């Protein structure tokens, strides 16, 4: 029986990078006889233009029926002035929520070939391999009440709510500990328990879950200290588990330790490891249509999909090896280019990975 993968290119550079990722996926499908069937649909601004909403019901139904979803990126200035509840980003939040994709895995890995592209000294980041586990369907992005009200003095006041239940914290903590068990058996939980009630509960529940994982060394950091430590001594971290807002910020910060956010994939998983896979970067409307975007994060998202949703380790390893071989050849898109390397565009980078994968 074939496995269904839904392709959602999205907006901005999304269609360009997705074209290259699909080329790699189709080659892997053929080379390793994976039995995948690919279907395509729209999300975000493209869905607003077509359906009037950022995520159509029929698209959501296709996502529910699929075994995995591969996403490009959403959003752009074209849709910035429309009502907040129907902006492109709401489609992304809705599909995560409706599919129950509560666990977001964001690796921050520095390829040795890109040590000179990092914003930090090579001796600080060499060998960097961090996994950030971010809670994805709770917290301040989904909390109610939220809105804007007029105070008695006529001034407008905006407000949001940051709620977390015990069960939401417990399930993401388990993901963090499970990831730590198959890596370096070190887990750092990041919160703001000195200020926030939700973080106080977060820390309490993480401590409870830790009792089931005696082999894992657990530490806690306040988010402001964690942000500082990521720059000061990032290799002290192995797995970080944190909430939605903090994870959003810290994972982008960690991405720059690797040289470019254009290198970083992500996985968003439900309780059964059905997932949606996407690059960590956004839609980059400023470079959309120029053919210069880095497709490697999306290609590596394909590898994560094969690994986490389908347990196809050999095919996943092969894609990662192909990317590494291309970097060995000195091939670079502009965001990771340095003197003496070969600067290429989006399509050329995708073609290079396809060629490397074909020759493995």
UniProtKB/Swiss-Prot annotation:
Protein location: Cytoplasm
Keywords of the record: Amino-acid biosynthesis, Branched-chain amino acid biosynthesis, Cytoplasm, Leucine biosynthesis, Magnesium, Manganese, Metal-binding, NAD, Oxidoreductase
Pfam family, one: Iso_dh
SUPFAM superfamilies referenced in this protein's UniProt entry, alphabetically: Isocitrate/Isopropylmalate dehydrogenase-like
Keyword Ribosomal protein: no
Residues binding NAD(+): 76-89, 282-294
Cofactors: Mg(2+); Mn(2+)
Cofactor note: Binds 1 Mg(2+) or Mn(2+) ion per subunit.
Catalysed reactions, semicolon-separated: (2R,3S)-3-isopropylmalate + NAD(+) = 4-methyl-2-oxopentanoate + CO2 + NADH
Intrachain disulfide bonds: none
GO biological process entries: L-leucine biosynthetic process
Transmembrane segments: none
Listed InterPro entries: IsoCit/isopropylmalate_DH_CS, IsoPropMal-DH-like_dom, Isopropylmalate_DH
One GO CC term on file: cytosol
Binding site for Mg(2+): 224, 248, 252
Pathway recorded for this protein: Amino-acid biosynthesis; L-leucine biosynthesis; L-leucine from 3-methyl-2-oxobutanoate: step 3/4
Function: Catalyzes the oxidation of 3-carboxy-2-hydroxy-4-methylpentanoate (3-isopropylmalate) to 3-carboxy-4-methyl-2-oxopentanoate. The product decarboxylates to 4-methyl-2 oxopentanoate.
PANTHER family hit by this protein: 3-ISOPROPYLMALATE DEHYDROGENASE
Subunit relationships: Homodimer.
Name of the protein: 3-isopropylmalate dehydrogenase
Taxonomic source organism: Pseudomonas syringae pv. tomato (strain ATCC BAA-871 / DC3000)
Phylogenetic classification of the source organism: Bacteria, Pseudomonadati, Pseudomonadota, Gammaproteobacteria, Pseudomonadales
Gene label: leuB
């Amino acid at each position: 029986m074939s496995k269904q993968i839904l392709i959602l290119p999205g907006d901005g550079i999304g269609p360009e990078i997705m074209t290259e990722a699909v080329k790699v996926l189709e080659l892997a499908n053929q080379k390793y006889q994976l039995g995948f069937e690919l279907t395509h649909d729209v999300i975000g601004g493209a869905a607003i233009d077509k359906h009037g909403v950022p995520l159509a019901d029929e698209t959501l139904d296709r996502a529910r029926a699929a075994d995995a979803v591969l996403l490009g990126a959403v959003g752009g200035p074209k849709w910035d002035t429309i009502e907040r509840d129907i902006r492109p980003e709401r489609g992304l939040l809705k599909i995560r929520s409706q599919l129950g994709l509560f666990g977001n895995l964001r690796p921050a890995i520095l390829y040795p070939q890109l040590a000179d592209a990092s914003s930090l000294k090579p001796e600080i980041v060499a060998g960097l391999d961090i996994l950030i586990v971010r809670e994805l369907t709770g917290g301040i992005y989904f909390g109610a009440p939220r809105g804007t009200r007029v105070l008695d003095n006529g001034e407008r006041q905006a407000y949001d709510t940051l709620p977390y239940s015990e069960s939401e914290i417990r399930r993401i903590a388990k993901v963090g500990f499970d990831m730590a068990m198959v890596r370096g058996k070190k887990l750092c939980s990041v919160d703001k328990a000195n200020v926030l009630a939700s973080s106080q509960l977060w820390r309490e529940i993480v401590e409870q879950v830790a009792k089931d994982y005696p082999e894992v060394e657990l530490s806690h950091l306040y988010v402001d200290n964690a942000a500082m430590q990521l720059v000061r001594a990032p290799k002290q971290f192995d797995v970080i588990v944190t909430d939605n807002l903090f994870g959003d910020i810290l994972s982008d910060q960690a991405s720059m330790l690797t040289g470019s956010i254009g290198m970083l994939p992500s996985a968003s998983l439900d309780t059964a490891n059905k997932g949606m896979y996407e690059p960590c970067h956004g839609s980059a409307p400023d470079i959309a249509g120029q053919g210069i975007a880095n497709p490697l994060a999306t290609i590596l998202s394909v590898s994560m999909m094969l690994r986490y949703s389908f347990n196809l380790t050999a095919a996943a390893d092969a894609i990662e090896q192909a990317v590494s071989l291309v970097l060995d050849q000195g091939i670079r898109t502009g965001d990771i280019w340095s003197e003496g390397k070969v600067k290429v565009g989006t399509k050329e980078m995708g073609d290079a990975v396809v060629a490397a994968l074909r020759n493995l």
